[in-house]
Amino acid sequence: MPEKLNTSARRATVTRTTKETDITATIDLDGSGTGNISSGVLFLDHMLTNFSRHSGIDITLDCKGDTEVDDHHSVEDIALVLGSAFLQSLGSKTGIQRYGWAMIPMDETLARCAVDLGGRSYCVFSAEFKRPAILGFSTEMVEHFFVSLSRTMQANIHLAIMEGKNTHHMIEAMFKAFAYAMKMAVAVTGKELPSTKGTL
């Protein structure tokens, strides 16, 4: 797949163009939590803006996709691009916390997330949503988003709803839990690579 990468400090820009989507995303791990999101899927815009604000990670994202067909291609490809941008912005990973975790309440909902940025792509997702879609965003794509993200980010992501009824609250709490887990995991807390293997 065509992909262009530019990195400096803890910042990366990734561009991916296919016959289904044209996406450019910039990640700044040491930003101020500013999200400029145009995904073509309104509810995903809302979720990624929330993620940016609560993680403190700046995200600029523009996606032109075939949403007249479905939201699947855009949501999946955005996750793949963001994962690549996260991985590139982490660089050698020297000094990072590596692990992060959070539990986030939102009214009746409680979401849990744990992240390992150790180079092992694996996602465990546990949630059932009553509504099939919100503002053009298919709720079945929430799991697919995080599975795709974990693949290109080379990260282990565990996400679960512990309690919840309202679909909006459940999805938003999951994105916020992921935000706080990532905020912890990407934090620079030392000078050594957080692995006994000598590589991540």
Curated annotation (Swiss-Prot):
One cellular component term from this protein's GO annotations in UniProt: cytoplasm
Reaction it catalyzes: D-erythro-1-(imidazol-4-yl)glycerol 3-phosphate = 3-(imidazol-4-yl)-2-oxopropyl phosphate + H2O
Cellular location(s): Cytoplasm
The entry's keywords: Amino-acid biosynthesis, Cytoplasm, Histidine biosynthesis, Lyase
Superkingdom, taxonomy of origin: Bacteria
A Pfam cross-reference name: IGPD
Enzyme Commission number(s) of this protein: 4.2.1.19
Pathway participation: Amino-acid biosynthesis; L-histidine biosynthesis; L-histidine from 5-phospho-alpha-D-ribose 1-diphosphate: step 6/9
Enzyme's top EC category: lyase
CDD domains: IGPD (cd07914)
GO molecular function per UniProt: imidazoleglycerol-phosphate dehydratase activity
GO biological process, one term: L-histidine biosynthetic process
InterPro entries reported for this sequence: IGPD_sf, ImidazoleglycerolP_deHydtase, ImidazoleglycerP_deHydtase_CS, Ribosomal_Su5_D2-typ_SF
Family affiliation: Belongs to the imidazoleglycerol-phosphate dehydratase family.
Name the record gives this protein: Imidazoleglycerol-phosphate dehydratase
Native source organism of the sequence: Chlorobium limicola (strain DSM 245 / NBRC 103803 / 6330)
